[in-house]
Each structure stands twice: as structure tokens, then as C-alpha cells.
Curated annotation (Swiss-Prot):
Its main location: cytoplasm. GO terms for cellular component: cytoplasm. The gene is argB. It catalyses: N-acetyl-L-glutamate + ATP = N-acetyl-L-glutamyl 5-phosphate + ADP. This is Acetylglutamate kinase.
Length: 308
């Protein structure tokens, strides 16, 4: 491709993005950052540049990040045993100390540094800062057919009870990009490890964000033939639970999306974080790079049976 043809292609891409830039100008977009996109150096740099560009054109990104592999690596180095129940890390006091150290002290600051180098004014936060994420201990009960319900003690695993939107709005107005580590605190000062998808969904709901984006290590929601499902409404998404389409880690991600939509978020996207510039491709182009779940008020009642 010669220089002129390349310039024409670039101009076409810019024109295609114009209606989306208008649509999202001044709006909040919450992005859950995790998976391979946090490990590959090229993807890390692209992510930071994507976020910086969004802020530059008047869109307000709020980032919530994970860090499971980094936590696991540090626990192994410290010879602290760790195990999972129902996909959640059982978190005793020693594990909680490591979780907070890794997420807040290391991973969060690395992301903030990368974004600042890209030109964004990023500010690192945990749920403790300004009581940003109020939490409580998660209660988990597993019911199996013909068996008594099993109560699982996950230790210091929490669930979100409230979000300090005043703090986040203040940072947005002053031109900052909040970068949130998924550590919460209760009214007694107890610290909790919270699933990053759940925090992202709760933040999006509290801010009434225009979009919620969850970066994953798959193309999006796949059907039984392993083909990408590009768009579903809430009712269709609920049906994916009952027909067996959703399995493993995709189940809590879709639940998180539905909860956010139920609280007023317009669309939630599960996108392929392995694709360079996936955020810009999803938000500012016609096709996108994942699965969108669209708010459907008529379907909200059907969601209650899945979410509660």
C-alpha cells in the first residue's frame, strides 16, 4: 500500500468514527482491564494509548483492573497456599495482605505509569481511598439436588455495597482518569478482595455509564458452534444461561453485564483484549470486536431469576 492509499484509508477510518465521537462526547465509559492485555507489552502500550485518546476527545474512561496471575505468582514466591471455590480465591488474612500489596502497590501503579507515559492524567485508587468501594463479606450458599445447602466461607472475599461517585465525578471533571484496584472496605475498616468484573459493573451502574467494556481472552460470547455472537438483548442473554451457551468464567461476566444494564447502563460489551486497539475498535467503528449486550427494559423482569 502506497503512502497516498494509506492516507486515504486513515481518513476513512476517522470519518467512520465521527458519529461515535459525537455520541460518546462527555459520557463515561467503564473498562475492566485484565487477562492477556495486561501481560503483552505491545497490548499494554496500545491500551494506554487508547485510554489517552478517549480522554483527549472528550470521553471519560474509568478503569478497573484485575491481577489474578500476579497475585498467584507472589503467593507462590511467599509459599502461601491458595485455592479457589466456585471460581473465587479463598482469601484468609495472609492472602488478603498479598492481594492488597500486589493489586494496589504494584499492578495499579504500573498501569497508572503506563497511562501517564501515553499522555493520560491517570490516578491510581483502591476501594479504600475516599471510601470509594464500600463492601461487605460475600455469603455463598451452594445448593445441589438431593443435598443440603453448603455454606462456603470464602474468607475476606467481598461484594460491592456502594460506590463513591462524587470522588469519581470530581476526578473526571478535573481531567483525570481513575484507575481502580478491586479492593473494598466495610464500615469497620475491614478489607475485602472483590472480583474485578463485579467492581467494574458496580462502578458503571453507579455512574450510569454509557458503556461497560470487559476485556477477556476470548473473542466474546461464543455459540455452540464456537462462532461469535455479536449482539444480544437482555432477554436473549438470559436465555444463554438456560441453553448451556454460557460456561465457566463467562457466566459471572454476563451476570455482571446484566446487573449493570438493569441499573441504567445502555450497553455492555465483552471484547477480545488480545486484539490491539480493541477499545477504539469496539467504541468507534461500525463492527466492533466482541459481543454487545443491549439494554432492554421489557426484558428486565426476566433477568431477576438469573441475578437474584
Amino acid at each position: 500500500m502506497d503512502c497516498v492509499e494509506n492516507a486515504r484509508l486513515q481518513s476513512k477510518v476517522l470519518i467512520e468514527s465521527l458519529p461515535y465521537l459525537r455520541q460518546f462526547h462527555g459520557e463515561t465509559v467503564v473498562i475492566k482491564y485484565g487477562g492477556h492485555a495486561m501481560k503483552d507489552e505491545a497490548l499494554k502500550k496500545a491500551f494506554a494509548l487508547n485510554v489517552a485518546l478517549l480522554k483527549l476527545v472528550g470521553i471519560n474512561p474509568v478503569i478497573v483492573h484485575g491481577g489474578g496471575p500476579q497475585i498467584g505468582k507472589m503467593l507462590e514466591q511467599l509459599n502461601i497456599q491458595s485455592h479457589f471455590r466456585e471460581g473465587l480465591r479463598v482469601t484468609d488474612d495472609a492472602t488478603m495482605d498479598v492481594v492488597e500489596m500486589v493489586l494496589v502497590g504494584k499492578v495499579n501503579k504500573e498501569i497508572v505509569n503506563q497511562m501517564n507515559l501515553a499522555g493520560a492524567k491517570a490516578v491510581g485508587l483502591s476501594g479504600k481511598d475516599g471510601m470509594l468501594i464500600r463492601a461487605r463479606k460475600m455469603e455463598m450458599v451452594i445448593s445441589k439436588e438431593a443435598q443440603a445447602p453448603e455454606i462456603i466461607d470464602l474468607g475476606k472475599v467481598g461484594e460491592v455495597m456502594g460506590v463513591n461517585t462524587t470522588l469519581l465525578r470530581s476526578l473526571e471533571r478535573d481531567g483525570f482518569v481513575p484507575v481502580i484496584a478491586p479492593v473494598g472496605v466495610d464500615d469497620n475498616g475491614e478489607t475485602y478482595n472483590i472480583n474485578a468484573d463485579a467492581v467494574a459493573g458496580a462502578v458503571a451502574a453507579a455512574l450510569k455509564a454509557k458503556r461497560l467494556l470487559l476485556l477477556t481472552d476470548v473473542a466474546g460470547i461464543l455459540d455452540h458452534d464456537k462462532k461469535l455472537i455479536r449482539s444480544v438483548n437482555m432477554r436473549e442473554a438470559v436465555n444463554l444461561f438456560s441453553d448451556g451457551t454460557l460456561t465457566g468464567g463467562m457466566i459471572p461476566k454476563v451476570k455482571c453485564c446484566l446487573e449493570a444494564l438493569e441499573e441504567g447502563v445502555e450497553k455492555a460489551m465483552i471484547i477480545d483484549g488480545r486484539t490491539e486497539n480493541c477499545i477504539l475498535l469496539e467504541l468507534l467503528t461500525d463492527k466492533g470486536v466482541g459481543t454487545e449486550i443491549v439494554s432492554d427494559r421489557a426484558a428486565q423482569a426476566a433477568c431477576n431469576c438469573v441475578l437474584r
